[in-house]
Amino acid sequence: MRRNCCHVSFASTLKILNFVQAFIGVSIIIYSIWMLHEYSRHLPVDPPPSASSSSGTEIATSVSEPLKNPIDFVASIILGSNGGDHGFNLRSLDLPAPWFIYSFMAVGILVCIVTFIGFIAAEAINGCCLCFYSILKTLLILLEAALVAYIAIDRHWEKDLPYDPTGELSSLRAFIEENIDICKWVGIAVVAVQLLSLLLAMVLRAMVSTPKPELDEEEDDENPRSRTWDPLLGPQGNQAPAGSSKIENWSSRIREKYGLNQSPPVNPKG
């Protein structure tokens, strides 16, 4: 496939946007590694007393009750009812202590993977790669939108999460609340970069997936060439007798010059 200036310009812009997103992903991974290093140096904070006061009997009953009434359990998850102890609670999950750091690092790795696929798609300018990148980018944007909507709707979202012994979740929330204006503009800029990269990928894929006009133009370019060869071949065939006549004239002149055409004299009979 031929790459015109429009393809190259769109691909270069997509590479720049992916570079910005890769910088964000690498920054998240580096910050997660720093948090994990700081957590390993210091002792973890003791869990709240409510988490340590649960007995084995209560845990067994809380696990067996949803199995006895599965319909009520599913309805409580969908409707979000707090009646009884059937509501799904993330605090009941057995997660490692630095779960927030691992989750934060997973977000950075996911961003880097999607960005790497975007680099490949922008370099190859392939329809399949661009389509796959567009799907991944759409899923990532939808996941971010769902997370923001959940935090905006549920004012007590921290109570639904497991306890964070590292304290990084609370410190991150305090930092965002102190610099809410800057964080808003940074979030808007990140979302704008992601949406613009998705738009460029879709436009570039649409441009790549329609190569038929280019093939027609190539065929039209080839037909005039074949037509131009026809008149050139025709006169050459017609010029062949003229060339042979010139050779005959030249040979006849040579014979006349050297007397080769003169017939020998005939002796008269006496």
UniProtKB/Swiss-Prot annotation:
UniProt key word Membrane: yes
Tissue: Expressed in rosette leaves.
Disordered, as annotated region: 212-249
Localization per Swiss-Prot or TrEMBL: Membrane; Vacuole membrane
Membrane topology, as annotated: Multi-pass membrane protein
Record flagged with keyword Transmembrane helix: yes
Protein name per the record: Tetraspanin-18
Species of origin: Arabidopsis thaliana (Mouse-ear cress)
Gene name for this UniProt entry: TOM2AH2
